[in-house]
Amino acid sequence: MGKRFPSGWFSPRVHPPRRQRSPMTNQATPGTASVWNNIEGIGFGGDYNPEQWPVSVRLEDLELMQEAGVNFLSVGIFSWALLEPAEGQYDFGWLDDVMDNLHGIGVKVALATATAAPPAWLVRKHPEILPVTADGTTLGPGSRRHYTPSSAVYRKYAAGITRVLAERYKDHPALALWHVDNELGCHVSEFYGEEDAAAFRLWLERRYGTIDALNAAWGTAFWSQHYGSFEEILPPGVAPSTLNPGQQLDFQRFNSWALMDYYRSLVAVLREVTPAVPCTTNLMASSATKSMDYFSWAKDLDVIANDHYLVAADPERHIELAFSADLTRGIAGGDPWILMEHSTSAVNWQPRNQPKMPGEMLRNSLAHVARGADAVMFFQWRQSFAGSEKFHSAMVPHGGRDTRVWREVVDLGAALQLLAPVRGSRVESRAAIVFDYEAWWASEIDSKPSIDVRYLDLLRAFHRSLFLRGVSVDMVHPSASLDGYDLVLVCTLYSVTDEAAANIAAAAAGGATVLVSYFSGITDEKDHVRLGGYPGAFRELLGVRVEEFHPLLAGSQLKLSDGTVSSIWSEHVHLDGAEAFQTFTGYPLEGVPSLTRRAVGTGAAWYLATFPDRDGIESLVDRLLAESGVSPVAEADAGVELTRRRSADGGSFLFAINHTRAAASVRASGTDVLSGERFTGTVEAGSVAVIAED
């Protein structure tokens, strides 16, 4: 337990932080620009795993790649056991051939460090690298991601194979990007082993400096949890009752940090050997992944890359896709990003793995491009015949060429070639939704007023409403610049720093319409309640004081004064400078404000004290859009997804994606890039138009 890590174990930042940008900036960071300098047009391809196939199939792959228009592939992600079959013994013959052959057909490569699954010989020699769960269970090999990022031994071996790969391929003309590890935090995102505990203690000591500062931050006077030294602290594992919330929150921060510090340790090797080659890892930004603070990770990635998979059972899965893509663009600070993985059709890991409908793959792919992706990639190139993912769809299905999926892959490749002029353009938004992983973590730690308050629910309800109206929206960190946004939505931002709260208040004072919801501003970054009445950090901005929470029982609803209903949450709101626009009805909150507004500077601050039903959300969004002056990207029939990308030279591209089974009208003028003809104003059922606007 008392183990100390050697100097240098905490790897330094290897390049400067990413520059924060205002919404309208069209300037790429140097690292991002260098990625696209290596790839012509929109990147198109997927994970390529040639080690699973004989040479004859690999040669056929080259023909099929050219037929489909592939120009970008990730290679070697899970190949460590073949590249280094025994410690210090390497076999690069197959990879040499693959790199040379791909270069021969003009394909650029995101070469992986191959570290996402340690080989069997390494696990046998060093079982201490295996991850340990909260109940003390050691997770064994036979799958993937079976290591802990805090293992000094694993870091040494991972850095070793990374260095050998970098030295061998540093001058290869196919190398465009380093794909560092893979889906960090997937399957296992919390680590409880002895080495993890030691790393956690060291992280805490560096964060707080003294044990007294930690005791104050964690409120350890409660339940006799006081610590006399950092050596007494363990990760928050299985315990008789609820655990210290400050300890839980810091453990979330630590695990997110540990995964990224492991990434940085490999990038340090790559920077040393190949300083001109950009580096990234594939995130999993979506409504399903909360364990990693991707906004804090972004500064260490030269280009943001993301994996996204639909939930087949979700009837509005295209809206969740838009949410994920908008979040990814926000993490990227507005830069173009890479869709590193999605599926051509069914996945293999959901309870019922339905295929995508005809045309859905094209709509999905172009929806990501519409929202900022400059590369569209899949898992994987060729569908495996063995292994856990053999029923996961791929670009080349088990049935080969004579399949719907392959024909749609070829059609998509042709469409992306036509969209080359879109590359480098950016999505412009005048509306923003504030998004913070730490607030997500803190709000869902146990012992809150209601288990029904989930961080994403209200946030996604507002995003959905804006999506349906064709209003473009950015996801922004609470500390990021809000200049240029006319509408800012702050949903269940339970914990917030003083600086972030001031940033949001400044947006209202500067002319923005700001909406803050219930259960926002309640605690500071230590999860200490801000005393004096809720909503704490936003009380003065909003001109309200909440005396007491009134969470609703499961299934209960409240009628509001405008005739709509709400659920989940209510509270006793007092006006303190604000004006009531809506009230609760019925005992015990009859006449108590449920929606308020306060004029602030040249803007306004609204407060929402409940979770409205869909009619209530729609009515409120209409009111906010009217006040802020934010308008839809264009006018179109219902069911058409609208997004605009604008290039630095002023050119604009309107993406109109028809998610319905009937032709739809879109009011726009220009040339449809996909057809090469003047846009007629109609998008056929299930089709996409990309209009280079006049």
Swiss-Prot record:
GO terms for molecular function: beta-galactosidase activity. Residues 1-31 are annotated as: Disordered. One of its GO terms (cellular component) is beta-galactosidase complex. Strongly inhibited by glucose. No activity is lost during treatment with 100 mM EDTA after 2 hours. Activity not considerably affected by metal ions (5 mM), including Na(+), K(+), Mg(2+), Co(2+) and Ca(2+). Completely inhibited by Cu(2+) and Zn(2+) (5 mM) and is strongly inhibited by Mn(2+) (11%), Fe(2+) (25%) and Ni(2+) (38%) in comparison with the activity in the absence of cations (100%). Activity not affected by dithiothreitol, beta-mercaptoethanol and L-cysteine whereas reduced glutathione almost completely inactivates it. GO terms for biological process: galactose metabolic process. Residues 22-31 have a biased composition (Polar residues). Optimum pH is 6.5 with ONPG as substrate. Over 90% of activity in the pH range 6.5-8.5. Highly efficient at pH range 4.5-9.5. SUPFAM superfamilies: (Trans)glycosidases (SSF51445), Class I glutamine amidotransferase-like (SSF52317). It catalyses: Hydrolysis of terminal non-reducing beta-D-galactose residues in beta-D-galactosides. Transmembrane segments: none annotated. Its EC number is 3.2.1.23. Keywords: Glycosidase, Hydrolase. Optimum temperature is 50 degrees Celsius with ONPG as substrate. Active at 4-8 degrees Celsius. 60% of the maximum activity is detected at 25 degrees Celsius and 15% at 0 degrees Celsius. Over 50% activity at 30 degrees Celsius. Hydrolyzes p-nitrophenyl-beta-D-galactopyranoside (PNPG), o-nitrophenyl-beta-D-galactopyranoside (ONPG) and chromogen 5-bromo-4-chloro-3-indolyl-beta-D-galactopyranoside (X-gal), with highest activity against PNPG. Also acts on p-nitrophenyl-beta-D-glucopyranoside (PNPGlu) and o-nitrophenyl-beta-D-glucopyranoside (ONPGlu), but with significantly lower activity. This is Beta-galactosidase. It comes from Arthrobacter sp.
